[in-house]
Amino acid sequence: MNIELIVQLTSLILISIAGPIIIALLFVKQGNL
């Protein structure tokens, strides 16, 4: 298996999971939620 492909897939999954969480945390800090 290609290590670079695995790294890219894991990074994409982490970004897709962490993205909405970070946005939600920013909204909570600003008090807009």
Curated annotation (Swiss-Prot):
It comes from the Eukaryota. The keyword Oxidoreductase does not apply. It is found in: Plastid, Chloroplast thylakoid membrane. Keywords: Chloroplast, Membrane, Photosynthesis, Photosystem II, Plastid, Thylakoid, Transmembrane, Transmembrane helix. GO terms for biological process: photosynthesis. The chain crosses the membrane at residues 5-25. GO terms for cellular component: chloroplast thylakoid membrane; photosystem II. It is a single-pass membrane protein. InterPro entries: PSII_Ycf12_core-subunit (IPR010284). PSII is composed of 1 copy each of membrane proteins PsbA, PsbB, PsbC, PsbD, PsbE, PsbF, PsbH, PsbI, PsbJ, PsbK, PsbL, PsbM, PsbT, PsbY, PsbZ, Psb30/Ycf12, peripheral proteins of the oxygen-evolving complex and a large number of cofactors. It forms dimeric complexes. HAMAP family: PSII_Psb30_Ycf12 (MF_01329). A core subunit of photosystem II (PSII), probably helps stabilize the reaction center. Belongs to the Psb30/Ycf12 family. This is Photosystem II reaction center protein Psb30. It comes from Euglena myxocylindracea.
